Design a protein with these regions (language model features):
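Short secondary-structure junctions
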Residues: 26-33, 83-87
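N-terminal beta-strand motif that seeds the catalytic metal site of vicinal oxygen chelate
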Residues: 1-19, 61-63, 113-114
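Short glycine-enriched loop/turn motifs at secondary-structure junctions
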Residues: 2-4, 55-60, 90-91
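Vicinal oxygen chelate
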Residues: 1, 10, 79-114
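Conserved short beta-strand elements that form part of the metal-binding/catalytic scaffold
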Residues: 28-61, 106-111
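Conserved active-site tyrosine of GNAT-family acetyltransferases
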Residues: 18-23, 77, 104
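Short hydrophobic/aromatic beta-strand element in the GNAT-like acyltransferase core
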Residues: 40, 48, 64, 84, ...
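Short amphipathic alpha-helices within nucleic acid-binding modules
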Residues: 21, 59, 71-76
Length: 114
């Protein structure tokens, strides 16, 4: 069995408010709105994040994205008024930061060493 797609779910209390925030995070509107409770962004050919209205579990997500240029990613966030935590270096030189959405869901963003 081969995994061909990954959809990383992010439970939120208010889908419409979350869509606005994630539009700023990603820099564009959702690629897919399958129903009134979900909205999804395609980040890679086979990797997606999606928000889903689920107030009982809102704030419980922890996902990780790896980018090729963390500094450029952070500059884009700053332009779109999205706050990120401090950048730390972990392991064998992976630089990471954490972005937390209004519900408390955490998105760790890292750049592996060159």
């Amino acid at each position: 069995m081969a995994v061909t797609y990954v959809f990383a779910g992010i439970p939120v209390a208010d889908r419409d408010a979350a869509v606005g925030w994630y539009e700023r995070l990603v820099g564009r509107p959702p690629d897919l709105i399958p129903n009134d409770d979900e909205a999804a962004w395609r980040l890679t050919e086979t990797g997606w994040i999606y928000v889903i209205a689920d107030a009982a579990r809102a704030g419980s997500a922890l996902n990780t994205l790896l980018v090729d240029d963390l500094d450029a990613f952070l500059a884009g966030l700053a332009e779109r008024k999205v706050m990120a935590g401090p950048v730390k270096t972990i392991g064998d030189g992976v630089r990471v930061t954490v972005v937390t959405d209004p519900d408390g869901n955490r998105l760790q963003v890292g750049q592996p060493p060159a």
